[in-house]
């Protein structure tokens, strides 16, 4: 409902709509596998960790961790075990429990022992990794701009029919006077960074703190690159390691 294949896997709405209404626009998924940080504020540092966020969010999918684990065990056990090994024992665990649910779900989660919570979280993390594997397959098709640039890089005259005259004027403005390319550069037309562009908040009484609030979230995320459920080696987590450094020289 939020990720329409005809719209680069987003919905085209100002804010996302799930079981409730969100505060930001649904992100397009095509090409997301190349992103360093995920969500508009970068509160996730991998595609698989990002895939988990909406599942437990109260206004998106509104689910909880044990419910997803039970669903996988009931409906996709064979596929799960082919990819990730034996499914842990879930018999006797509450159907609805999780660290981010309502009071009843949180209480049920707290009543589970550490091993049970870790087992469920491992299944949940693997669910995100399976979703991310599919999402990484969604790639942009070569565009007319790609063909234009490839010709110039190869030293060939660009086909005059590839870009219209008004598009060529826009491209010159984008690269030149507009200086859009300062931030929008590279194959994906992004520098993968965060910028304060001076746009006023949608709601002045409740400003969106954006990246300022997200840094603490990604550092404390149990599913981050350095966490126990990550398959990444420490040297593959340079951005997060830099962010978490307490060296004054890096502040």
Describe each PLM feature range.
Residues 1-251:
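Periplasmic c-type cytochrome electron-transfer domains
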């Amino acid at each position: 409902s939020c990720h329409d294949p005809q719209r680069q896997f987003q919905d085209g709405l100002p804010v996302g709509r799930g079981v409730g209404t969100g505060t930001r626009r649904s992100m397009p998924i095509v090409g997301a596998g190349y992103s360093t940080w995920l969500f508009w504020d970068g509160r996730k540092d991998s595609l698989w960790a990002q895939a988990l966020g909406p599942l437990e969010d109260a206004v998106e999918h509104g689910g909880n961790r044990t419910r997803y684990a039970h669903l996988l065990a009931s409906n996709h056990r064979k596929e799960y075990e082919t990819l990730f090994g034996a499914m842990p024992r879930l018999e006797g665990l509450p159907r609805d429990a999780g660290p981010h649910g309502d009071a009843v779900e949180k209480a049920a989660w707290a009543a589970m022992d550490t091993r049970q919570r870790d087992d469920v979280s491992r299944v949940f993390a693997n669910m995100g990794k399976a979703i991310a594997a599919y999402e990484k397959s969604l790639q942009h098709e070569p565009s007319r701009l790609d063909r234009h640039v490839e010709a110039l890089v190869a030293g060939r005259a660009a086909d005059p029919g590839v870009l219209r005259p008004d598009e060529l004027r826009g491209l010159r403005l984008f690269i030149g006077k507009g200086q859009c390319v300062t931030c929008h550069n590279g194959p994906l037309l992004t520098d993968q960074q965060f910028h304060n562009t001076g746009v006023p908040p949608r709601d002045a009484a409740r400003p969106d703190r954006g990246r300022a609030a997200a840094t603490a979230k990604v550092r404390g995320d149990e599913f981050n690159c350095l966490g126990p459920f990550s398959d990444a080696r420490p040297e593959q987590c340079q951005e997060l390691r830099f962010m978490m450094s307490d060296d004054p020289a890096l502040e």
